[in-house]
Structure formats: C-alpha cells, structure tokens
Amino acid sequence: MGLKPDKWIREKSLNEAMITPFCEGLVGEGVVSYGLSSYGYDIRVSDEFKIFTNINAEVVDPKDFNENNVVDFKGDICIVPPNSFALARTVEYFRMPKDTLAICLGKSTYARCGIIVNVTPFEPGFEGHITIEISNTTPLPAKIYANEGIAQVLFLEGDEQCETTYSDRKGKYQSQTGITLPRILKQQ
C-alpha cells in the first residue's frame, strides 16, 4: 500500500473527477491553506454548519439522534462555542477509486488553537461530500472560516482491489450531500 503523490491526485481528479471542484495548486496567502500539496489534498469547509446546542437538555444518542440537538448556521465565519462541537461538510465532492482508501487529518493551524477536526476514512468506492466533525476544546469561542482549509486528505492505494467496496455494500452514507447526521441501519 503506497501513499500517493500530487501527480497521481491531479490525474485522478482531472481525468476521473475524484475531487470536484479540484484546486491544482496550494492556496495559502491570507487564508487557511487548501488545495493540492505534495502528498495530499487540503480540503475546504463549506459555509454550512450544524452547531450543537443544549437548549433541549437532551442526551446525545448516536442510535437515536435528535435533530433538535443542533442548530443550522450558514455564513462565512462559524463561531463554535467553548467546549462545544459542530458538524460541517466539505466544499469538495469525492469519488473514491475502488483500490484507494483516504485518511483525513486536521490542519495544524486549527489544532494549535485547540480546534480538533475528525473525519473517518474515505473507503474505496465511497462517493459524496465529507461530513466534518469539529471540536472546540478551549474555554473560549472559536472561529471556523468557511471556504478555507480545514483538513488534509492522504490517499493510500492498495496492493490489490478489495473484494467489496463501500458502494457495493450500499454504505449508509453513500452519495451524501450536505451535512449528514448519524445514521443507524434498522434491523430487518
């Protein structure tokens, strides 16, 4: 399994629409950087957010998530409250090759401010926007800048193609657009 370089990422994105829209260079002046880097791609956070609230004083249950636990926000700057959490999505839409897994890591610019980004791996055959989990670990409000970098994606090509892709098994987040809240498949 090998880490893929900029040339491979560019070719897959331009010829097979792996990343749409695709930024061929690294944009970094006056913004949190985004675009193609040496061995990865820095994704942007869109201007759509879901910010957690405790107005209803409910327990967060991943098996029975209540949409009233979040407040929708759209704007150029999202303020995540102290010790709180927000969901967002990427500007980019991904179409993962059947022999490639992607791992996403938060940007150090945000991490150095106490803002932690989590994204689960992009599995082979996955397609859709990426839902981003943002934690403000500080006792202060934190700014997230829409349409700027939020995390870096690293692409790992397998030595051989997997038997069953995310698409083949009809993954519950396949073809997601916008911010997708937790889903649990119901037993038949």
Swiss-Prot record:
Pfam families: DCD (PF22769). DCTP binds at K107, S108, T109, Y110, A111, R112, Q152, Y166, Q176. It comes from the Bacteria. Its EC number is 3.5.4.13. It is an enzyme of class 3 (hydrolase). Keywords: Hydrolase, Nucleotide metabolism, Nucleotide-binding. Pathway: Pyrimidine metabolism; dUMP biosynthesis; dUMP from dCTP (dUTP route): step 1/2. It catalyses: dCTP + H2O + H(+) = dUTP + NH4(+). One of its GO terms (biological process) is dUMP biosynthetic process. The active site is at E133 (proton donor/acceptor). CDD domains: trimeric_dUTPase. InterPro entries: dCTP_deaminase, dUTPase-like_sf, dUTPase_trimeric. One of its GO terms (molecular function) is nucleotide binding. Gene3D superfamilies: 2.70.40.10. Homotrimer. Catalyzes the deamination of dCTP to dUTP. Belongs to the dCTP deaminase family. This is dCTP deaminase. It comes from Sulfurovum sp. (strain NBC37-1).
